[in-house]
């Protein structure tokens, strides 16, 4: 069940909010846990025992860690991290590793019978759990003694599908203040966030994404007959689709959290206006970047042990970033691609980028869009080699004119909406209450029309 589906918007959401608001404060966490369990099990209960065991194990393990003697204080969380990572590796990467070993060593190992469907949200809730265990070990937080409260943190349904990856310490105060966390101001902000995110997802992402789908499906032969201009048009469309899909879903997540009384960190901050790759990654998937910084980069020494060690740490972080996104070599290549770009910037380029005005933005957009070409290279019909050939070796083929005629306005709208202009306009509109309510109502109605007319409700980043 995704947030842009009819069943969520017209059944689950209103009923869950109504019940949540009606119960007294002391019962809100229990109700929220029940609602999160229903949400998690909506498409099946096959993986419910898995997440239940993980919640119980990590709840008890953190309590044990806090009481352990100093000699064991570092070993216990390490064991917890290995257990949780082991679960993630088994479900997400085991068959990829087996296939890789078979190709390299020709061993003929049999693939594991674990299916192709990942447990819902496993990449996100495993990282939340690991951050909790590490923070308990380092004394940044005390272990949660209330089992229901801890279970709500792990299962919190607004964050189950695509995050954001919120640390326990960022939610703890509100988890414990169930009587006062729901306020009219927070609910109003949550409704705005949710509708704006829904608009990005169903009006922009899904509509622009149809262009990329049409291009790689042209003639049933993928990119084979696509011209160079059309290949660039397609990868630009995919870049916009991915941004609006993920940023929109993240906004919906934070909007739902605010409706439930929680303030969660933003996951995006206009990444396509960045003037460097370094700045881009401060604006894109902020909570994932922060997680790798806090739990891998800094513990390894960060930039405190010389440039060579810093580059090694960066290599490990970006290899892990690529691997986190999926069990495929194109994701690993994508992560290392950014390692190379960031290394170049840190070594000498960043100081020149800071002096420029226009060219740093062009440079950043070019390499980010090219990066999305690597990212999407496992899609049928768009192998990386063929895509790069189409992009950089001028070729004739299917003209972009037809696609520009059908999608040109959408592409322009997408470019405008990925800038700071919509935020500025909303600030101006918000000064007039009547205008604000009217625009909000119209946008909500338009989103509802798109949702009802849609034939397939998905979220791209739910696959990671």
Could you tell me what each predicted segment is?
Residues 1-463:
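Membrane-embedded transmembrane alpha-helical bundles that form the catalytic cores
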């Amino acid at each position: 069940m995704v947030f842009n589906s009819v069943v969520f918007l017209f059944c689950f959401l209103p009923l869950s909010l109504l019940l949540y608001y009606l119960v007294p404060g002391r019962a809100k966490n229990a109700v929220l846990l029940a609602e999160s369990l229903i949400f998690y099990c909506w498409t099946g209960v096959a993986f419910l025992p898995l997440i239940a065991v993980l919640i119980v194990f990590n709840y008890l393990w953190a309590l044990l860690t806090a009481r352990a003697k100093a000699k064991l204080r570092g070993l216990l969380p390490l064991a917890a991290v290995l257990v949780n990572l082991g679960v993630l590796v088994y479900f997400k990467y085991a068959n990829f590793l087996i296939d890789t070993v078979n190709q390299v060593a020709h061993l003929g190992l049999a693939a594991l019978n674990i299916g192709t469907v990942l447990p819902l949200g496993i990449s996100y809730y495993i990282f939340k759990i690991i951050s909790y265990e590490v923070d308990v070990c380092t004394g940044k937080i005390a272990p949660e003694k209330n089992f229901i409260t801890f279970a709500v943190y792990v299962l919190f349904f607004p964050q189950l599908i695509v995050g954001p990856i919120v640390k326990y310490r960022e939610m703890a105060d509100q988890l414990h203040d169930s009587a006062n966390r729901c306020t009219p101001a927070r609910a109003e902000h949550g409704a705005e966030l949710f509708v704006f995110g829904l608009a990005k997802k169903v009006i922009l992402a899904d509509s622009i994404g149809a262009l990329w789908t049409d291009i790689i499906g042209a003639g049933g032969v993928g990119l084979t007959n696509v011209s160079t201009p059309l290949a660039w048009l397609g990868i630009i469309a995919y870049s916009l689709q991915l941004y609006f899909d993920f940023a929109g879903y993240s906004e919906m997540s934070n909007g739902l959290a605010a409706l439930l009384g929680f303030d969660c960190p933003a996951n995006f901050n206009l990444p396509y206006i960045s003037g460097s790759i370094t700045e881009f990654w401060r604006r894109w998937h902020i909570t994932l970047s922060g997680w790798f910084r806090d739990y891998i980069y800094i513990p390894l020494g960060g930039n405190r042990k010389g440039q060579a060690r810093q580059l090694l740490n960066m290599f490990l972080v970006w290899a892990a970033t690529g691997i986190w996104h999926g069990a495929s070599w194109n994701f690993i290549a994508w992560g290392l691609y950014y390692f190379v770009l960031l290394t170049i910037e840190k070594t000498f380029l960043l100081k020149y980028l800071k002096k420029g005005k226009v060219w740093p933005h062009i440079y950043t957009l070019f390499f980010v869009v090219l990066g999305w070409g690597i990212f999407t290279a496992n899609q049928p019909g768009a192998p990386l080699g063929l895509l790069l050939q189409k992009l950089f070796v001028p070729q004739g083929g299917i003209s972009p004119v037809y696609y520009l005629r059908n999608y040109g306005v959408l592409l322009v709208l997408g470019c405008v909406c990925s800038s700071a202009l919509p935020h500025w306009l909303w600030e101006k509109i918000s000064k007039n209450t009547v205008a604000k309510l009217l625009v909000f109502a119209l946008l909500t109605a338009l989103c509802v029309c798109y949702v009802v007319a849609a034939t397939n409700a998905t979220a791209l980043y739910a696959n990671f």
